[in-house]
C-alpha cells in the first residue's frame, strides 16, 4: 500500500467499475497531483545534478566512496555498511526505482524498462530489503520516465488519462503495483512524466534528469549522471545482457541479477544469445548513426551524445564473440570484486 506525507493513500478509483488500466491511470494522476509530491518534485528539480566520474583528470573524480551502478533492466540491493552510493542513469522512458528500508538502511535500486517486469521485479527487490519484516517502513523514489508523447485528455480524468508512449504505461504499472501490495511504501519522490519534462531547443520534449544517486547512509537522493568510467564494472557485457535476455526464457519477466549484497561483489549471471541476434546486430551495424538513433531508441530526441557509440561498441563485441560460451565459459557468472582504491577487478 502507498503512503504520501505519512498518510495512507486511498485509491478512490478502485471503488468504481473502471478497467484495470483506467484505475491505474487515475491512481497515478491522483498521486502525482498530491501537494506533497508536487512540492517534492519542485525541490528535486532545483537540485544540482551530480556528475559521477572516476577519471583521474576529472576534478570531481572520487573512488574513495564505494559505488554500485545499475544498468537497464538490472537491480541491486546494497548494504550501507558496504556501499556508500548506488545509482543509475540513461533512464529516458525507463524509470529508476529506489526502495529503502528506513530501519536497516538496506537499499534496492532497479532500472525498470517495461511494465512486464514490474511484478516480479519488485518482488526481487524486496527479498533482501524487507529482511523478513513485512511491516517495515519503506521509502520509495522514482526518477525518469519523461512525458515522451502528448498525453490527450480522453475522458476528463486529467492530462495523464490516456496511456500512450512508453513512459506512461510503465509509471502506471509501478504505482498500481505498489498500491496493491501489502508492504508499506512511503512515496518520497515521483520525478516522472510531467514533473520531469522540459522542451529542448527544437521544442522536443525531453527529461530534465535521467538518473539518480542514493546515499545509502542517509537515504538522500540526488539527480545524477555517470560516464564510461563510472558505469562499471563489465559495461559492455552487462549492456548486451539486456538485448540477449529477451531470447532467454529464464529471464522472462525478471530483472537481471547483477550484484551480491553479502559479499559486495558483482556477479554477472550468464545469459545466452543466438545466431539470430548476431545476424540482426550485423544488419543494424550497417545503418547510419541517424538511422540507429531512430530505429533503436524509444526516445531518439532525448538520448545522450554517446548513445549510438555505446550501441556500436556492444555490437562490435557480439560480432567478435558470436558464441556466448566465450563470455560465460561453462555457463559460469563473471565475478568482480572491489579493490582497495575503489575500482573493480575480475576474479
Curated annotation (Swiss-Prot):
PANTHER family (alphabetical): N-TERMINAL ASPARAGINE AMIDOHYDROLASE, PROTEIN N-TERMINAL ASPARAGINE AMIDOHYDROLASE
List the molecular function annotations (GO) for this entry.
protein-N-terminal asparagine amidohydrolase activity
Q: Which UniProt keywords apply?
A: Hydrolase
Question: Could you tell me the superkingdom of the organism this chain comes from?
Answer: Eukaryota
Lineage, highest ranks first: Eukaryota, Viridiplantae, Streptophyta, Embryophyta, Tracheophyta
Catalysis performed (reactions): N-terminal L-asparaginyl-[protein] + H2O + H(+) = N-terminal L-aspartyl-[protein] + NH4(+)
This chain's function reads: N-terminal asparagine deamidase that mediates deamidation of N-terminal asparagine residues to aspartate. Required for the ubiquitin-dependent turnover of intracellular proteins that initiate with Met-Asn. These proteins are acetylated on the retained initiator methionine and can subsequently be modified by the removal of N-acetyl methionine by acylaminoacid hydrolase (AAH). Conversion of the resulting N-terminal asparagine to aspartate by NTAN1 renders the protein susceptible to arginylation, polyubiquitination and degradation as specified by the N-end rule.
In Swiss-Prot or TrEMBL terms, this protein is called: Protein N-terminal asparagine amidohydrolase
The EC number of this protein is 3.5.1.121
Top EC class for this record: hydrolase
Q: Could you tell me the gene encoding this protein?
A: NTAN1
